[in-house]
Amino acid sequence: AAYVLGLYLAQIKGAMFRDEIQQTLDSLKDMPRKIQWVLDTQTKAVHDAAAQMVDAKSFLFLGRHVGYPVAMEGALKLKEIAYTFTEGFAAGELKHGPIALVDEGEPVVFIVPPARGRNVLHAKVISGIEEVKARGAYIIAVAEENDPDVERYSDVVFWRPACPTLMSPLVDVVPLQLFAMDMAKLKNYDVDKPRNLAKSVTVE
C-alpha cells in the first residue's frame, strides 16, 4: 500500500513519468512470484541454518540503504519469537561499535545489495563481510542469486531472485522471518503467542 501511495503522490506532483509509474507497478505486481521463488527454493537452506545456529546466544544484523530496515526487521523477529539477543545496525556503522561485539563464531547476518546498479553499496557491504569474517564471525547473507563475492565469503546464503532495489525488502524479509520461525520452533516456543508482547497500547 505504501508503494502505491508513493506512486500516486509521484503522479500528482509530476515527479515520475507515466511509463515509469506503470513499470514500477508491473514490478510490484511481480513481487508475489519472487516471494514464492524464495519459499520454493530457500526454505530448506533456512531451516538447516536455523538448526545449526539454534544454540547461538546472540546475532548481529547489518544492512545498507534499503537493506537497513530489513536488518532491523530480521533482528526484531528473532528477538520476538526465538527470544535470542539480537541487534540490527546500519552496515556503515560497523567500525563505530558493532565490530567490537564480533567474537569467534558470532553469527552476523548481512543484507547484500545487488552488484548491478549502485554497485558501490555492494562493494562496501562485501568489504564489511570480509572484515567480520577475518575476526572469526559466522556469516549469513541474504543476496541476489549467483553473486560470486557473496559465495566466496559467506558460510550460508539465502538467495533472492533479481528484483528492483527499492522492492527488494519485500523479498529479503521472507527468509529472515522463516529463520526466526524455525529457530523458535526448534526451541519449542509457540510462534503464534510470543511472551510478554503487547500488540496494542492502552493509555490511561
Language-model features: locations:
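A SIS-like phosphosugar-recognition module
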Residues: 1-204
